[in-house]
Amino acid sequence: NSSAPVSSPSRCGLTTGKFPIEVGINTFLNNKASNKKCEQRNFLSDKNPSMARAFQSAGYATGHIGKWHMGGGRDVHNAPSIKNYGFDEYISTYESPDPEPAITATNWIWSAKDSVKRWRRTEYFVNKSIDFVKRHKDQPFFLNLWPDDMHTPWVPEFKQKDNKSWNTEEAFIPVLAEMDKQIGRFIKALDELGLSENTIVIFTSDNGPAPSFQSARAAYLRGTKNSLYEGGIRMTLLIKYP
């Protein structure tokens, strides 16, 4: 089970090992006014424990590539650097203290003006992840690869101009297929680099699916994202190990 049924607090729980309420994050991080209304902090304090920092202290190279959403973005400009949480290097999205310019051409989660288009974002993250692994293959490493393409809007390449369909099952399926392809490419790279027999890969999610498709995406469990029923907090968990 995840520690919360929505993104930001769940990610904080995974990062720190604490209950989200302990770190002052109880729903998705938004602008300052919304955060205040929800009685939560504007960002995860870097004074909290961090899984990456523990690995870093043990001599691991550490990297974060993908969505952050634990502080930064919108009108929150004082969130700590991702490096403060124990990451040697990072690439992140709009909802972070230092978003990657290639995927944040405007002041929003994504834009048609981004040089890396929405439908190429996971490919971009995997390219950067493979590069990270290649550079650190001769030492222990810890990598967060947190793609965000399964979060709405789902923008497959063939539907890029049809914004009326970005929340439909028709759009969801090819986006899911593309993510599956890219994760497979990353696993293959580990094989080709001779790292599969010395690397643990954990595949999971931050929360249940958005309420859609007659709840079928939650495997017919009661509840979905934003719900404390099983459909909101019971996650896929796959672990590949030597």
Regions from the language model: what does each represent?
Residues 1-242:
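Formylglycine-dependent sulfatase
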